[in-house]
Design a protein with these regions (language model features):
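Cleavable N-terminal signal peptides of Sec/SRP-targeted secreted and luminal proteins
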Residues: 4-20
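Solvent-exposed adhesion/ligand-recognition segments of exported proteins
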Residues: 16-131
C-alpha cells in the first residue's frame, strides 16, 4: 500500500513536471499545471507511512497523516522542543518531519496538505491524456 501511495504521488509529480511537448517535438495545447497547494511543500507526503533502511537522503520535508509519526520508520527521528516537528540526519536541512500525531498546529497543517494532495491527484487523474 505504501508503494501504491508513493507511486501515485510520483506519477502526479511527473505529470506536473511535463511541459507540454510531445515525443516528436510538436507543441501540445497548453493545459494549466496541476496545483499541488500545500502538498507541494513536501518531498515525501503519505497517508500510510514511510520506511527507510538508512541509505536515504531526502531533500525537503517529509509528512504523514492521518497516521502517527510511528509510521515513519528508519529515520531515527529527533523531536524538536516544540513537539511540532522532528528532524533526522537523513532529511536535509532545513527539511523537517511532520506527523498528524505531533502538537498543534501540525495536525491541521497535515490535514490540509493531505487534502491538497488528494485534490491535485483527482485533478491530474481527470485530465485527458495528450497522447
Amino acid at each position: 500500500m505504501l508503494y501504491r501511495s508513493m507511486l501515485s504521488l510520483g506519477s502526479l509529480l511527473l505529470a506536473v513536471s511535463f511541459h507540454g511537448t510531445s515525443a516528436v517535438g510538436r507543441k501540445l495545447t497548453e493545459e494549466p499545471v496541476v496545483n499541488l497547494g500545500t502538498a507541494g511543500d513536501f518531498a515525501i507526503l503519505t497517508k500510510s507511512g514511510v520506511t527507510t533502511t538508512g541509505v536515504t537522503s531526502v531533500d525537503g520535508d517529509v509528512g504523514t497523516s492521518p497516521i502517527a509519526a510511528e509510521a515513519i520508520t528508519g529515520f531515527s527521528l529527533i523531536m524538536d522542543s516544540s513537539n511540532e516537528y522532528s528532524t533526522s540526519t537523513l532529511v536535509t536541512h532545513p527539511g523537517k518531519v511532520w506527523a498528524a500525531s505531533y502538537t498543534s498546529p501540525t495536525p491541521s497543517k497535515m490535514t490540509t496538505a493531505i487534502s491538497d494532495m488528494e485534490t491535485a491527484y483527482t485533478d491530474a487523474a481527470g485530465r485527458v491524456d495528450p497522447d
